[in-house]
Amino acid sequence: MLQRDYFIRIIEEFTAALAQFLEKKEGQQRQRYLEDLYRQYVGDYSLLRNFTVEEAMLYARDQWKEEERIDRLEMLAELYLVEGKGLQNPLRDMLLNKAFSLFDYVDAHSHAFSLSRQAKMAEINKLLCR
């Protein structure tokens, strides 16, 4: 129980840090902050960003505890989404597709229904003109 409370606190910190990132202006400082978010909450930026969805899933299985895996995959999807929205194609679509795939996986395997997650998936579909 204590470990779950600790991880819930990590999720809350991640949400606050992501909101702070979204307030930053474009530029190198914003990019460094994004890379720090990856490093602090999910892992190495250059590694995770360049993974396919399948590779990210294998990484999750190997690196994260089972009870944290779904939440960390959702964090990774959030990072893909916010980064993808700030880029041009083809990187934009690549990251948005990865974000959608991870959100879809989390939605199917999570024990909690999330309207926020559903809204993000709808937003991605709209951005990708699906």
Language model region names:
Residues 1-73, 105, 126-130:
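N-terminal alpha-helical interaction modules that lie
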Residues 22-33, 83-95:
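Short coil/turn connectors between adjacent alpha-helices in alpha-solenoid helical repeat scaffolds
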Residues 66-92:
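Mid-chain, well-packed structural core segment of small domains
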Residues 89-130:
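Amphipathic alpha-helical binding modules
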